[in-house]
């Protein structure tokens, strides 16, 4: 019974640190001039951590928190997660067209914010989701 309690507490702490990383990412994006449209937006296909807009660009953000600096291969979503994220962003974007004013051109972008235990941010911009039209730069 003691082990289950320890595992529960460890998981709960990881969840709280992840939420804190999302909140700090939100503040960072606001300071950069992004308008936050949604936070932890749920869809039938999964959840997107942050959805922001600046000008004609809509930014979808996945926030990762790790205690240690991870390799990029550990940060990038797995193929199954990429498919889920792509379907979720497509679902959200199709609904955003009804909420946002029409524009001649909308640019979609997907970024990953990777936070480590010491508060270091590594931002991956324009991350490609395989089997999609988005590309890693």
Language-model features: where?
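Short acidic/glycine-enriched loop/turn segments that link adjacent beta-strands
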Residues: 43-46, 118
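Surface-exposed interaction regions that form or flank ligand-binding interfaces
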Residues: 1-5, 104, 132-137
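Acidic-basic catalytic patches of nuclease active cores, encompassing PD-(D/E)XK
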Residues: 1-39
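Catalytic cores of nucleic-acid endonucleases
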Residues: 7, 65-118
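Short, solvent-exposed loop/turn elements at beta->coil junctions and helix N-caps
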Residues: 39-42, 111
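Protein kinase-like catalytic core scaffold
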Residues: 46, 57-59, 109-111
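Conserved catalytic cores of phosphodiester-cleaving nucleases, focusing on short active-site segments
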Residues: 29, 50-69, 85
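Short, low-complexity, polybasic intrinsically disordered segments
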Residues: 113-137
């Amino acid at each position: 019974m003691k082990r289950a309690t320890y595992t529960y507490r460890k998981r709960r702490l990881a969840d709280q640190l992840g939420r804190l990383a999302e909140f700090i990412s939100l503040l960072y994006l606001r300071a950069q001039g992004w308008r936050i449209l949604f936070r932890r937006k749920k869809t039938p296909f999964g959840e997107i951590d942050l959805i922001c807009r600046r000008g004609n660009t809509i930014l979808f953000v996945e926030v990762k928190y790790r205690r240690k600096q991870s390799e990029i291969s550990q940060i990038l979503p797995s193929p199954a997660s990429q498919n889920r994220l792509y379907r979720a962003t497509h679902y959200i974007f199709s609904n955003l067209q009804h909420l946002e004013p029409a524009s001649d051109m909308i640019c979609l972008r997907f970024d990953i914010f990777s936070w480590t235990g010491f508060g270091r941010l590594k931002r991956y911009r324009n991350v490609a989701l395989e089997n999609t039209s988005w590309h890693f730069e």
